[in-house]
């Protein structure tokens, strides 16, 4: 629906992407506190929140509007706080250091090197999220 409406209304690409993101993830964002670290990281990656943090803000605002629409809704949208805190944890991982440690001085083919680095960075981010979830308050 978001895709068809965006095409019909000729909305800017950024708006179309935000609508697509909200349509795909709004139910998951509402229950973000219950997500496992892998799903949480997938959400951060899907929102492209590391490169474009504004997209996460747009997603959270859309989700908050949906959640706060009933008259008896709470004044605070806790999933937004939780997801923003998770993003801080993910950003706290030094991807450059992880990449250097993952490859060392090994001479790997470019594709294998990129795959090794991507897997190591994901593992480090997951470890950071696991540690955070053990200590984070709901």
Describe these PLM feature segments:
Residues 1-138:
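C-terminal subdomains that position terminal phosphate/3'-OH groups for nucleotidyl transfer/ligation
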């Amino acid at each position: 629906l978001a895709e068809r409406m965006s095409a019909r209304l000729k909305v800017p690409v950024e708006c179309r992407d935000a609508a697509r993101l909200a349509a795909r993830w709004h139910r998951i964002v509402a229950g973000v506190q219950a997500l496992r670290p892998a799903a949480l990281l997938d959400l951060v990656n899907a929102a492209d929140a590391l490169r474009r943090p504004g997209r996460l803000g747009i997603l959270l605002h859309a989700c908050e509007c949906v959640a706060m629409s009933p008259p008896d809704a709470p004044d605070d949208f806790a999933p937004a706080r939780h997801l923003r805190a998770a993003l801080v944890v993910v950003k706290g991982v030094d991807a450059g250091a992880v990449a250097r440690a993952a490859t060392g001085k090994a001479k790997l083919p470019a594709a294998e090197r990129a795959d090794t680095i991507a897997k190591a960075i994901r593992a480090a981010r997951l470890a950071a999220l696991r540690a955070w979830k053990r200590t984070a308050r709901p």
